[in-house]
Amino acid sequence: MAVRLSIALLLSAIAMTSAGAADEPKSFACNFAGGAAHVYEKGQFVPEKATALSFGIAAIDNQAQTAELRTERGAGTLRVVQAVNATHFLEVVTEGSLHITTIFDKDDAKGAYPAVHSRHFGFFGQPIVTQYHGFCEAKE
Protein backbone atom coordinates (compact mmCIF):
# COMPACT_ATOMS: atom_id res chain seq x y z
CA MET A 1 0.00 0.00 0.00
CA ALA A 2 2.80 2.43 0.94
CA VAL A 3 4.61 1.61 -2.30
CA ARG A 4 1.50 2.38 -4.39
CA LEU A 5 0.98 5.65 -2.53
CA SER A 6 4.63 6.63 -3.11
CA ILE A 7 4.35 5.83 -6.82
CA ALA A 8 1.09 7.80 -7.09
CA LEU A 9 2.68 10.82 -5.40
CA LEU A 10 5.74 10.59 -7.65
CA LEU A 11 3.60 10.41 -10.80
CA SER A 12 1.51 13.37 -9.61
CA ALA A 13 4.65 15.43 -9.03
CA ILE A 14 5.98 14.56 -12.48
CA ALA A 15 2.66 15.46 -14.10
CA MET A 16 2.54 18.82 -12.33
CA THR A 17 6.13 19.59 -13.34
CA SER A 18 5.43 18.71 -16.97
CA ALA A 19 2.24 20.77 -17.03
CA GLY A 20 4.04 23.75 -15.48
CA ALA A 21 6.86 23.54 -18.01
CA ALA A 22 4.36 23.46 -20.87
CA ASP A 23 2.87 26.74 -19.61
CA GLU A 24 6.23 28.52 -19.59
CA PRO A 25 6.84 31.01 -22.43
CA LYS A 26 9.10 29.80 -25.24
CA SER A 27 10.29 33.31 -26.11
CA PHE A 28 10.56 36.81 -24.63
CA ALA A 29 11.09 40.39 -25.80
CA CYS A 30 13.19 42.18 -23.17
CA ASN A 31 13.61 45.92 -22.66
CA PHE A 32 15.97 47.49 -20.16
CA ALA A 33 15.50 51.25 -19.88
CA GLY A 34 17.81 51.77 -16.93
CA GLY A 35 21.18 50.53 -15.90
CA ALA A 36 24.60 51.31 -14.53
CA ALA A 37 28.11 50.61 -15.75
CA HIS A 38 31.41 50.63 -13.89
CA VAL A 39 34.75 50.91 -15.68
CA TYR A 40 37.99 50.09 -13.86
CA GLU A 41 40.39 53.01 -14.31
CA LYS A 42 43.50 53.99 -12.34
CA GLY A 43 42.90 51.52 -9.52
CA GLN A 44 39.18 52.07 -8.99
CA PHE A 45 35.78 51.43 -10.53
CA VAL A 46 34.32 54.59 -12.04
CA PRO A 47 30.53 54.73 -12.56
CA GLU A 48 29.13 55.52 -15.99
CA LYS A 49 25.58 55.64 -17.32
CA ALA A 50 24.49 52.61 -19.31
CA THR A 51 22.41 53.14 -22.44
CA ALA A 52 19.03 51.44 -22.93
CA LEU A 53 19.12 47.86 -24.14
CA SER A 54 16.62 45.58 -25.94
CA PHE A 55 16.87 42.01 -27.20
CA GLY A 56 14.87 38.82 -27.60
CA ILE A 57 15.21 35.35 -26.16
CA ALA A 58 13.67 32.60 -28.30
CA ALA A 59 13.52 28.82 -28.75
CA ILE A 60 13.66 28.25 -24.99
CA ASP A 61 14.07 24.55 -24.26
CA ASN A 62 14.15 23.95 -20.51
CA GLN A 63 14.72 20.21 -20.98
CA ALA A 64 17.85 20.74 -23.11
CA GLN A 65 18.78 23.88 -21.11
CA THR A 66 19.23 25.95 -24.29
CA ALA A 67 17.80 29.09 -25.86
CA GLU A 68 18.66 31.63 -28.56
CA LEU A 69 19.62 35.27 -28.08
CA ARG A 70 18.22 37.53 -30.80
CA THR A 71 19.62 41.03 -31.35
CA GLU A 72 19.77 43.53 -34.20
CA ARG A 73 23.27 42.19 -34.94
CA GLY A 74 22.35 38.51 -35.09
CA ALA A 75 21.74 35.48 -32.92
CA GLY A 76 23.66 33.68 -30.21
CA THR A 77 23.42 30.59 -28.04
CA LEU A 78 22.27 30.74 -24.43
CA ARG A 79 22.46 28.24 -21.59
CA VAL A 80 19.31 27.99 -19.46
CA VAL A 81 19.39 27.51 -15.68
CA GLN A 82 16.00 27.11 -13.99
CA ALA A 83 15.56 28.52 -10.46
CA VAL A 84 12.59 28.35 -8.10
CA ASN A 85 11.05 31.70 -9.15
CA ALA A 86 13.22 32.70 -12.10
CA THR A 87 15.03 31.53 -15.20
CA HIS A 88 18.67 32.46 -15.82
CA PHE A 89 20.06 32.75 -19.35
CA LEU A 90 23.86 32.64 -19.65
CA GLU A 91 25.80 33.78 -22.71
CA VAL A 92 29.52 33.12 -22.90
CA VAL A 93 30.86 35.39 -25.63
CA THR A 94 33.74 34.23 -27.85
CA GLU A 95 36.16 36.69 -26.25
CA GLY A 96 35.34 35.28 -22.80
CA SER A 97 32.80 37.85 -21.65
CA LEU A 98 29.90 36.61 -19.55
CA HIS A 99 26.37 37.99 -19.92
CA ILE A 100 23.60 36.86 -17.56
CA THR A 101 19.90 37.60 -17.92
CA THR A 102 17.51 36.62 -15.13
CA ILE A 103 13.79 36.69 -15.85
CA PHE A 104 11.65 36.42 -12.73
CA ASP A 105 8.10 35.11 -12.42
CA LYS A 106 5.43 37.25 -14.06
CA ASP A 107 4.12 40.27 -12.19
CA ASP A 108 0.42 39.80 -12.90
CA ALA A 109 -0.42 43.39 -11.91
CA LYS A 110 2.07 44.75 -14.48
CA GLY A 111 1.53 41.99 -17.04
CA ALA A 112 5.27 41.58 -17.57
CA TYR A 113 8.24 39.68 -16.17
CA PRO A 114 10.74 41.68 -14.05
CA ALA A 115 14.26 41.08 -15.36
CA VAL A 116 17.92 41.89 -14.71
CA HIS A 117 20.76 41.75 -17.26
CA SER A 118 24.44 41.82 -16.25
CA ARG A 119 27.57 41.93 -18.39
CA HIS A 120 31.11 41.19 -17.26
CA PHE A 121 33.82 41.92 -19.80
CA GLY A 122 37.09 43.67 -20.44
CA PHE A 123 38.05 46.24 -23.05
CA PHE A 124 41.78 46.59 -23.79
CA GLY A 125 42.55 45.10 -20.39
CA GLN A 126 40.11 47.29 -18.45
CA PRO A 127 37.31 45.47 -16.59
CA ILE A 128 33.82 46.77 -17.36
CA VAL A 129 30.69 45.59 -15.57
CA THR A 130 27.13 46.63 -16.35
CA GLN A 131 23.78 45.84 -14.83
CA TYR A 132 20.38 46.68 -16.27
CA HIS A 133 16.90 46.31 -14.83
CA GLY A 134 13.69 46.17 -16.82
CA PHE A 135 10.96 43.87 -18.05
CA CYS A 136 10.41 41.06 -20.51
CA GLU A 137 7.16 40.19 -22.26
CA ALA A 138 6.24 36.68 -23.31
CA LYS A 139 5.96 36.14 -27.07
CA GLU A 140 4.24 33.32 -28.93
Label each region the model flagged.
Residues 1-5:
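Positively charged n-region of N-terminal signal peptides that target proteins for export
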Residues 6-15:
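Bacterial N-terminal signal peptides
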Residues 17-22:
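Sec/Tat signal peptide C-region and signal peptidase I cleavage site
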Residues 25-67, 98-102:
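Short, solvent-exposed loop/hinge segments that bridge or flank secondary-structure elements
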Residues 54-100:
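Predominantly extracellular/secreted and cell-surface proteins with exposed
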Residues 55-58, 100-108, 133-138:
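Hydrophobic/aromatic beta-strand elements that line small-molecule binding cavities or substrate pockets
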Residues 111-124:
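Low-complexity, intrinsically disordered Gly/Pro/Thr-rich segments
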Residues 121-140:
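Edge beta-strand at a domain terminus
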